[in-house]
Swiss-Prot record:
Residues 48-61, 99-111, 1181-1194 have a biased composition (Low complexity). It comes from Streptococcus pneumoniae serotype 2 (strain D39 / NCTC 7466). This is Pullulanase A. The lineage of its organism: Bacteria, Bacillati, Bacillota, Bacilli, Lactobacillales. It is found in: Secreted, Cell wall; Cell surface. Residues 1226-1256 form a propeptide.
Amino acid sequence: MRKTPSHTEKKMVYSIRSLKNGTGSVLIGASLVLLAMATPTISSDESTPTTNEPNNRNTTTLAQPLTDTAADSGKNESDISSPRNANASLEKTEEKPATEPTTSTSPVTTETKAEEPIEDNYFRIHVKKLPEENKDAQGLWTWDDVEKPSENWPNGALSFKDAKKDDYGYYLDVKLKGEQAKKISFLINNTAGKNLTGDKSVEKLVPKMNEAWLDQDYKVFSYEPQPAGTVRVNYYRTDGNYDKKSLWYWGDVKNPSSAQWPDGTDFTATGKYGRYIDIPLNEAAREFGFLLLDESKQGDDVKIRKENYKFTDLKNHSQIFLKDDDESIYTNPYYVHDIRMTGAQHVGTSSIESSFSTLVGAKKEDILKHSNITNHLGNKVTITDVAIDEAGKKVTYSGDFSDTKHPYTVSYNSDQFTTKTSWHLKDETYSYDGKLGADLKEEGKQVDLTLWSPSADKVSVVVYDKNDPDKVVGTVALEKGERGTWKQTLDSTNKLGITDFTGYYYQYQIERQGKTVLALDPYAKSLAAWNSDDAKIDDAHKVAKAAFVDPAKLGPQDLTYGKIHNFKTREDAVIYEAHVRDFTSDPAIAKDLTKPFGTFEAFIEKLDYLKDLGVTHIQLLPVLSYYFVNELKNHERLSDYASSNSNYNWGYDPQNYFSLTGMYSSDPKNPEKRIAEFKNLINEIHKRGMGAILDVVYNHTAKVDIFEDLEPNYYHFMDADGTPRTSFGGGRLGTTHHMTKRLLVDSIKYLVDTYKVDGFRFDMMGDHDAASIEEAYKAARALNPNLIMLGEGWRTYAGDENMPTKAADQDWMKHTDTVAVFSDDIRNNLKSGYPNEGQPAFITGGKRDVNTIFKNLIAQPTNFEADSPGDVIQYIAAHDNLTLFDIIAQSIKKDPSKAENYAEIHRRLRLGNLMVLTAQGTPFIHSGQEYGRTKQFRDPAYKTPVAEDKVPNKSHLLRDKDGNPFDYPYFIHDSYDSSDAVNKFDWTKATDGKAYPENVKSRDYMKGLIALRQSTDAFRLKSLQDIKDRVHLITVPGQNGVEKEDVVIGYQITAPNGDIYAVFVNADEKAREFNLGTAFAHLRNAEVLADENQAGSVGIANPKGLEWTEKGLKLNALTATVLRVSQNGTSHESTAEEKPDSTPSKPEHQDPAPEARPDSTKPDAKVADAENKPSQATADSQAEQPAQEAQASSVKEAVQNESVENSSKKNIPATPDRQAELPNTGIKNENKLLFAGISLLALLGLGFLLKNKKEN
């Protein structure tokens, strides 16, 4: 640790005064300290400004970038991990003042003011609302463990005339028969002898339990039920210390935690069971997750328990109870596992399955004793056996349950449920593998229809006119077929008056248990023009109408699978994500387009840009039919800034998995045109040597009814009681169910076979079971062997309640090499991400663990195990959240309206892009990431902050380090409901180097990086063993000035052909020096492929931002480089000249004077080689391959003996000449002064020793 001058001075005075013989030693020791200071192994120019560039001979001036208002006039956007209203601030519950921490060891039990204490041996029953108005005519009839069971029905009940009232409602106290009392049974009746509530009972969970509550539906609880739409989280600590204890929560809640992590909601309100927080819930909430936090701690220790809590029974409970760091979530305030039945399903002809709140401690004989099953006639059905699944919290009853047409009634104690027909039973009885959908034949003269709906009583097809989708032509009944199918053939005999069915529309009319619905064919191949604004008109408009089409006859007939350039395996892919409308909605290119903007056809006109950039695959945001949009207005440009209520959509609200949306068609009213136009787009992508990846959304639908109307309680994952599970407002498709899995696989096969696509990206893939995704992959690869699949592998699997299975998430990667997942670990460490988005990360000045960064760069993320580099999608930006440019601005708190800040943001952006494109695995680029795309809300009315009720939806208000808002401070994240003004791809910024030099420089930089990546296998290694053998960390933490957490990294890769590459990144705000030692001395002979201004596959003649030093390599602030040493130890010919800026640039900064940088000293040539020992990260890296050792040795010798003339032939001059090109750091002068001081101190030390020797 460096001492302060005053501290050092004090120590020295004490030493001279107190010691004689030690004085010389102190001086000699001081000289050694100074010697060490004179020879640092990694140095920093601490005063170097962030935007420093090398002091070139030809200094130019950088023009301030044009403001977006010159080219923009439009609207705004949105967010994935939070609901559409995530912009709202976290609601604070009105809470009682917090009391001082108590040392009590049990929860607070203060009674409600209006409530009298409960006498010993009494049990209080609270009633929210009496069944009838006349309380005097109602009573509580009791039996079981009460002192005096009620007698003389009905008048022998405890009369509510004597009931007392509190804040909740009425209550009566019942005397128990003694301490052994365990069960209190009761009902509310009236004097007329009517049982008003049905039989109820409550089990005493613990001896001290002395009250229970009935809600308005007369369900029994061990706590006071909360108002609808609220859950209370109670937290009891035995130490009484609630200081800085808080809750971080998400899920089906109105306002998920969204403050800066880990600033959760504090436990401040005090209640009967410790502290509590009331959380408002979404409508029909089912589950939420949370973390208990201790904000007095740091890092991961802030979590009281490291694992997420998840509560999935919000339908049945409005309070939960937590205790200390107990892993359990209790549904009673006594912290015991309360066995309650929560649902029942008919799962097979010999089995019924019931779900329970818990089965901890449950015994088979007790379950049998307290269970009862009756059929629809009320007759008891014998239970022959029970199987208890404690982990799954379910009991399977065995018996004769062969009646599959009617429900059964299952009861356990006072809990009673009517069975729902489970998907298991439907799979066992009705699963079908034949052809489904509408098959148009005989030149349109015939249509074969097949629909699967086993519970339907009747099915008809309603046919609509081809020129007027609202006009009914006629209705034809379908006939019941095998295994739950309904079939019909439409032709001239159906009396519809149609000779050619092509282009006509249809829906299915399904009658079931007296209810009729109109449903969309899930296998429809095209649709009528869709307008979700009409959904409320009637049933015919709440879902789209399918169209009779023959896709095989539409579009280019020569369409085939793509032959993708520079691509053999998934590690070779460079994926570029784009939205069809965004790519051509910029009004700046309106005159250049010959086709309507925002369409498949217009996209074709800009494909050459992507070909020139060098990407291998274009990933299109969802192009299949989505719900919330008006396709009839797709031609209207949304030029005003808006971030809500826009006729715009990303497409993550699917309506059909076979039909394309009409939003990107030149004529949405023509159901054939969208098919032909999309085929043409794929064909043109293939002609340019690129592939097409479709973003698909099988994890949820836009509306639950889309599939529930087809077959209730089947297509979705189910809760334990048999109701469908939801997500984002729609249903979670249950891909473990046979017909749902079939739908997914059939859809994938159809899209590959019909449109010849080259891959799929699965939205929220972790919501699916791994088996279904694997099956889809194999089916698709059987058609297109070059196809790739990737997905969001977040751990979000819900599945059917209490039926765990292997999910298609990040944890699956160690078991498969078929599908890849996005790495949030590299994203979060390089630029930040949920829940810490906007906090400084590696490329934005936040120090990060160097080993963690290195592991991510070699496709070994720290939060999941990848057994192949191809398992990992390397990315730092996607359509979700803020763009990369915007998140950098937010993180460094610098307003891009200032030219110097704009340039700095781009420097950091280029660092991030370089790290992703030189990483192992598969790189992924968000459209516009290459040029610095922004979604800044540049409406003149929003140039400064506005009132809270005027804040744009899904926006962040950005401020600088002083707290001042940016110019136009609102930036939109998740722009799925924003206008074209917000979402457009800005072609001027991407291509006009004169108006936007920084943007075009960044774009060209990425183009060069892609070319570099594709020029060698070094960055595309195919196995972990290859990576282990060929990639070595240079910047080992704890050595050579590299800290454990730092903002620099350097590593070396040996390509399969023997070429050696090295990547160095300095994300610091000052220059940093990298010590190469002996192990990496051969890099001195390298050519530079990337510097601070450009990148490519050939050497740069005059690289900028770096210089060789005697210890190694020095990089300017915010600079990265890629080096290459060819196989034979000589560099490739350097041909890339440094391109002059397209506009005059800002004057270069001169390095500060030496005295301003006392620690920036250049290593001296006389330092022993012992300080340059090899240092590498992997265990086997201490021994280089013999050829590499020989090469390193020869390269080092060559560097030491190289003449100036010879070095000038390389692309980096030798050190003497280099000083003329790069800023003079003053290091030599500093070294001379230091060594003079060292010599003087050493002489003084010797003098003291000699003097003392004589005196002694």
